[in-house]
Amino acid sequence: MSFDIAKYPTLALVDSTQELRLLPKESLPKLCDELRRYLLDSVSRSSGHFASGLGTVELTVALHYVYNTPFDRLIWDVGHQAYPHKILTGRRDKIGTIRQKGGLHPFPWRGESEYDVLSVGHSSTSISAGIGVAIAAAKEDKQRRAVCVIGDGAITAGMAFEAMNHAGDIKPDLLVVLNDNEMSISENVGALNNHLAQLLSGKLYSTLREGGKKVFSGVPPIKELLKRTEEHIKGMVVPGTLFEELGFNYIGPVDGHDVLGLVSTLKNMRDLKGPQFLHIMTKKGRGYEPAEKDPITFHAVPKFDHTSGVLPKSSGGLPSYSKIFGDWLCETAAKDSKLMAITPAMREGSGMVEFSKKFPDQYFDVAIAEQHAVTFAAGLAIGDYKPVVAIYSTFLQRAYDQVIHDVAIQKLPVLFAIDRAGIVGADGQTHQGAFDLSFLRCIPDMVVMTPSDENECRQMLHTGYHYSDGPCAVRYPRGSGTGATLEPLASLPIGKGVVKRQGEKIAILNFGTLLPEAAAVADKLNATLVDMRFVKPLDTALILQLAGEHDALVTLEENAIMGGAGSGVNEVLMAHRRAVPVLNIGLPDYFIPQGTQEEIRADLGLDAAGIEAKIHDWLA
């Protein structure tokens, strides 16, 4: 889409933050209005993360206006809210390509812009990185400032509090901005609070505060009285005691949509020494009524008509694997009150909305706390309950030690329902589920299953739920099933694959939902096709039988080749001294960028044509 200068005259003046800082302060509200409208127009045409960015327009403008970016370091947590940041930092005309193949990255990305200090996508990393940036700048005496922006969801994670605890100890010159959009701006975030924030962040108050501490440092009773008086004054209007106890100077909460007020407060805070904390209140979806009313639905959107405010409905076709999981969860919980379902802030994405409403006493959203989710599940298992941890593949990485130390070593019967395994698509490198088979396969006593369709997914969830000798994992992709008939639930024999087609010379050992592509290739090559189903334990007897009956084996998976299911097949053959050629097909040894799932699979040779071509090239 071409940029309409007449429609956005103030925004047209801002091709960089240097130009932004040349604008008169009085023009900033108009800039914010145009930026918000441009964001709405762009994302509705291209798709992307939406509501979060609408809520951070004023904050983004104020930060770049006050701080000398990119020299000063601005770090965004997660990055859903960073679209306005991209627009103001030289990427305005490319914003329509975001999350598309070859387009702008969905999150701040170091390789894309000097303004993107930290590549992000996962939650709660900003403060830790910000401390490092601040310490590095101090050691080099560069007078460079560091600012982190973190949301009210991300700040609940343990990593954020670990970082703040460290900051309180070493006291770097760092500003943490809490973007609190959990509720609309309420009465306690009004004129008094905004005035107090500017007063408490000002040089006069800061000088008196620090000077008083020095003068009375040797008089403990007076020092303590001053401390309590300050806390009392702040405590009348602010909820910052926790952050003060962690060693931060807390300011807020203030109106995050008052750009002029934010500029004044940030200017006051810019030169303060030590860890600073600014708490702003924003409205997710601000300025677009449908998104304000339903920020969860409008968090990430497909292309839609923003004049109607109606998102396109799904085609009503095949159910997603997430829905298959959610339906299985409800079906099983209706029969077994011992089932306990756990999610780290992924209720909607994991298909658990209906379950959370029907079985609220058996549902636990632990927030962005993957480590806690896994060890919490371990405790439930110790208490003779049956925990099911619903988690995205990419986020399970954050709880790897807990899977090993708190679950697997103790052989606790915890079921991991691993969604978004394999190619995820538009969210790019940080969200592809490329590694779970590799890092789970090496854990002793772990059962790892890869369904080839939605019916097999249900059967595997049932199998894992009723397995009592240790943890089980069922990994399934983002997207819809194949239309398979859903059969009555029954446990599968552990570690047994199924021959789907008998052929000659070549055997294709498929792990997961690429089975339809593998079937098309097997038909063309007259190859044997096997649905292996289990990555661990592998069907050793079947692998050895196939090796004895065929000239070559091909393994197929949507996981990293290194350490994946195919590597397991190689290990079996080497251990039994079977000298049969094996071609491992899967994800290559680099981080997979964004695109649609179909585009990425075609690029990687994981569609039927690509798989066939890889086999032909290998045999040539």
Swiss-Prot record:
Keyword Calcium among record annotations: no
Source organism of the structure: Klebsiella pneumoniae (strain 342)
Signal sequence residues: none
Oligomer and partners: Homodimer.
A cellular component term, taken from the record's GO annotations: cytosol
UniProt EC number: 2.2.1.7
Official protein name in the record: 1-deoxy-D-xylulose-5-phosphate synthase
Job description of the protein: Catalyzes the acyloin condensation reaction between C atoms 2 and 3 of pyruvate and glyceraldehyde 3-phosphate to yield 1-deoxy-D-xylulose-5-phosphate (DXP).
Gene: dxs
Required cofactor names: Mg(2+); thiamine diphosphate
Binding annotation for thiamine diphosphate: 80, 121-123, 153-154, 181, 288, 370
Chain residues that bind Mg(2+): 152, 181
Molecular-function GO terms, alphabetical: 1-deoxy-D-xylulose-5-phosphate synthase activity; magnesium ion binding; thiamine pyrophosphate binding
Catalytic activity: D-glyceraldehyde 3-phosphate + pyruvate + H(+) = 1-deoxy-D-xylulose 5-phosphate + CO2
